[in-house]
Amino acid sequence: MEPGLWILLGLTVTAAAGFVPCPQTGGAGRTSVPRAPRVAGSEGDCEDSVASPRRQTVAPTAGKGPSPGSPGRGQAAEGDPGHRRVRRCTCFTYKDKECVYYCHLDIIWINTPE
């Protein structure tokens, strides 16, 4: 491959590695919902999906399948966003190696069976 293509590929991967999109609610009608202006230091913050790195968040039915009386996937198709996994790390970018390292150590520690 030519060096220019390698550089383009490397820049694309590097740029994509630090991007963590915040979930958007409301679908096509989002324009009618007023949003607060972004604060300069708040890049990477998702208020409704950020969890403390020390707090373990597990759904009450995480290990169970759908119960016989529950609608299952049909409920998610009707407009319910379904189960969304919360963000455990509050690192602003993946380029913050120290934050990512300690956050993932904490996740591994929490998920390790005794």
Swiss-Prot record:
Gene source species: Oryctolagus cuniculus (Rabbit)
The UniProt record lists the keyword Signal: yes
Signal peptide (residue range): 1-17
Family per similarity comment: Belongs to the endothelin/sarafotoxin family.
Functional description taken from the UniProt entry: Endothelins are endothelium-derived vasoconstrictor peptides.
Protein name from the UniProt record: Endothelin-3
Family annotation (Pfam families): Endothelin
GO cellular component, one term: extracellular space
UniProt KW keywords: Cleavage on pair of basic residues, Disulfide bond, Secreted, Signal, Vasoactive, Vasoconstrictor
MF terms (GO), sorted A to Z: endothelin B receptor binding; hormone activity
GO biological process: one example: regulation of vasoconstriction
Subcellular location: Secreted
Site (Cleavage): 109-110
Propeptide segments, given as residue ranges: 18-86, 110-114
Disulfide cysteine pairs (residue numbers): 89-103, 91-99
Matching PROSITE patterns: ENDOTHELIN
Domain of life (superkingdom): Eukaryota
Claim: Disulfide bond is one of the keywords in the record: yes
Region called Disordered, residue ranges: 24-83
